[in-house]
A protein has these predicted regions:
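Alpha-helical scaffold segments in soluble metabolic enzymes
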Residues: 2-6, 26, 79, 114, ...
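Short, conserved charged micro-motifs
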Residues: 59-76, 107-114
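Short glycine/proline-rich, acidic loop/turn segments that cap or connect secondary-structure elements
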Residues: 80-97
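Structural signature of PLP-dependent enzymes
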Residues: 3-25
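PLP-dependent enzyme catalytic core of the Aspartate aminotransferase-like
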Residues: 93-130
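Conserved small-domain helix->loop->beta segment predominantly found in fold-type I
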Residues: 14-16, 28-61, 88-90
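Generic non-transmembrane alpha-helical segments
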Residues: 30-33, 75-85, 118-126
Length: 130
């Protein structure tokens, strides 16, 4: 019942969808400016607004074998967790090495905006210290 009250308090199910779609838009804008990351699903019409999956397109990363790529992603994820800015954003275990960001309505748009520079920071920190 608390969850239903919360949904009502923010404006109903339409608002939930709006928040999630805006989170995806925030990530899209960030990806479009990035030189190192892309959407795993390249077809914009098929992308999930809740489970946003990203793959690394940087040549530096893609020269590694899959094991080294997973290790690199794990370092990025670990740095973000240590800074307490993101938890559990590693891609699915059976998916190619990737990041998976929850974009559902429980993540406020300002928090999603704040996350993007942190992901850049973690990636570049790992790359520059390799």
């Amino acid at each position: 019942l608390d969850a239903l009250r919360w949904v009502e308090s923010i404006g109903g199910s339409n608002e939930l969808v709006k928040i999630s779609n805006e989170n995806l838009k925030i990530v899209e804008e960030w990806v479009n400016k990035s030189k190192w990351i892309k959407f795993m699903c390249e077809d914009k019409n098929l992308r999930s607004a809740t489970s946003i999956t990203l793959s690394i397109k940087d040549e530096w990363f893609n020269k590694f074998n899959e094991e080294k790529q997973r290790e690199t992603v794990k370092k990025i994820v670990s740095m973000l967790k240590k800074e307490d800015v993101a938890n559990d954003i590693n891609g699915y275990a059976k998916a190619p090495p990737s990041l998976r960001i929850w974009g559902g309505s429980t993540v406020q748009n300002d928090d999603m905006k704040a996350l993007m520079p942190w992901v850049d920071w973690a990636y570049h920190s790992v790359k520059n210290n390799a």
